[in-house]
Amino acid sequence: MSENEIKWHTLEKHQTKDIHDGHVNGSLIPVWRNWDKTISVKPEMVYVTSINPGERKGPHLHIIRHSYYVCIKGKVVFIIKEKSGKYLEIESSEENPVLVEI
């Protein structure tokens, strides 16, 4: 992937069900499976960050890094400045999970 390339992958979301009565008890979102070939650079670190309701984080700047992001609860809008100077907005949420690769 070139330095200027930004990718995003729409992720699958599956309901999970209780084993006793079958009611929906949550969801499952496969972020990475080795046969999908969505992750092009082997991760060296994985972490989870959270934010309280009504709060905002950012801006946050990384100059040299290959990163993957996905929102697992709520909604996040990633605002990414491309090498051309153009800004790109990518939304990821618990309803519509998107894996962003920068």
Predicted features, each with a name:
Residues 100-102:
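Short, intrinsically disordered, charge-balanced linker/junction segments flanking boundaries
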Residues 1-98:
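Non-catalytic, conserved peripheral segments adjacent to functional cores
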